[in-house]
Amino acid sequence: MTNLNYQQTHFVMSAPDIRHLPSDTGIEVAFAGRSNAGKSSALNTLTNQKSLARTSKTPGRTQLINLFEVADGKRLVDLPGYGYAEVPEEMKRKWQRALGEYLEKRHSLQGLVVLMDIRHPLKDLDQQMIEWAVDSNIAVLVLLTKADKLASGARKAQLNMVREAVLAFNGDVQVETFSSLKKQGVDKLRQKLDTWFSEMQPVEETQDGE
């Protein structure tokens, strides 16, 4: 297994939808989560870069698909945050369409990291993301973020509860706790990404450009 240097991750581009993304080759691992789940903080902690992914003070600001390259043909994808109450309904629907389309049609997408606040896990949209991924044979890592907000016993109880709940999806779904503040769970995240990037088959360029 290759240990990638995530500190070398750099921003490639932003796209409003799947049609504007670069060619569907290599391996992509996407990060998804509700607008306040700590997605940007997790990406910044993973790569040890303070501002790789912009942490917005206004949840719901990240409306684009953001691509980052870790190494040649190995990319991390920051998907638009979902479920923020103050975003207009029309925009919410647009994002959900873009998310669904990306998860179902992007062949190079081979792993999905779903981030949830450990205090409020498995909301409807979180479950929908996991369901979409499992239906598309995409491996899932659930990160229960802001784990430092709970005492050790409560943290363990939440972890066990979510691990039990995801069995119902009948897919490759792993659950771990994570804290950007305390750097907790970062090694497990890196190990999982290394495994995915090492063991999964990169998508090659096709003649018709699909």
UniProtKB/Swiss-Prot annotation:
Cofactor (UniProt): Mg(2+)
Sites where the protein binds Mg(2+): 40, 62
Origin superkingdom: Bacteria
Pfam families tied to this protein: MMR_HSR1
Transmembrane segments: none
Residues that bind GTP: 33-40, 60-64, 78-81, 145-148, 178-180
Cellular component, GO, one term: cytosol
InterPro entries to which the protein is assigned, alphabetical: G_ENGB_dom (IPR030393), GTP-bd (IPR006073), GTP-bd_ribosome_bio_YsxC (IPR019987), P-loop_NTPase (IPR027417)
PANTHER family reported in the protein's UniProt record: ENGB-TYPE G DOMAIN-CONTAINING PROTEIN (PTHR11649:SF13), MSS1/TRME-RELATED GTP-BINDING PROTEIN (PTHR11649)
Function according to Swiss-Prot or TrEMBL: Necessary for normal cell division and for the maintenance of normal septation.
The protein's name: Probable GTP-binding protein EngB
Source species: Shigella boydii serotype 4 (strain Sb227)
